[in-house]
Amino acid sequence: MKLTKSRLEPMIDASIGNKPAPMLEEFRGFVKQTSGYGFAVTLAEPYYVKTAAEILHPLGKKVCTVLSYPLAGMTHETKMLQARTAIADGADELDISMDLSLFLSGRYEEAKEDMKGFVHLTQEHNVLMKMIYFASRLSADDQKRAAQMAVELGIPFLKTNPGFGAVTTPGQIRFIKQHYAGMIQVMASGGVRIAEDAMAMVEA
């Protein structure tokens, strides 16, 4: 499978990468730079969603933000407020961390119920939702359990990891596809920095 620029760009959510706390002018410059490419979306921290939308929406480009980041250790009400604010500010997509503490404590139904409110909210506002499920922190059984939860909730995308502080492997992508192909899409996040990394994920 030949990797071309036009084929690869729509698969990428552009992020500022290893600079998680950019200054305003740095972020503006990053957004303007991404606007010249065919990326699926440009990622913005919640504070910068409105800034990104002001630049990108007139160009027909989309904005994504991450919520309850990185480990979802907030109350459900706080996370829902954050989601509503992001949508009002112009977010077209929301990457939402499942509550890792609940999940690893075996409180799966509570973790599922926590995600359910986001599913309803994003469907109501026609906003794409991706669930961050922390593949690098989970056993194989727990990866399947998280994927099953997302499928049952009707979440369209799984995102392997937070983009900062974790590395996704092609094996993690293959694992989800092996068990849930056709039921949910999976996006690699974390450690995908060069074309060779991206190609390995596409081939997985």
Regions found by a protein language model. Give the residues of each.
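Conserved, mostly hydrophobic/aromatic
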Residues: 13, 52, 86, 131, ...
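Glycine/Thr-rich beta-alpha phosphate-binding loop at enzyme active sites
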Residues: 100, 105, 133-174
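Alpha-helix-loop-beta-strand connector modules within alpha/beta enzyme cores
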Residues: 46, 50-71, 108-130, 152-153, ...
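Hydrophobic, well-structured mid-protein blocks that either form specific transmembrane helices
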Residues: 81-83, 87-134
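Glycine-rich, proline-tolerant flexible connector loops at the mouths of alpha/beta enzymes
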Residues: 31-51, 69, 94-113, 160-168
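Catalytic cores of alpha/beta
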Residues: 74-88, 138-149, 173-182, 186-188, ...
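Conserved N-terminal beta1-alpha1 strand-loop-helix module at the mouth
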Residues: 1-84, 88, 145, 149
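Structural preference for beta-strand elements that scaffold enzyme active sites
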Residues: 7-11, 40-41, 60-64, 93-95, ...
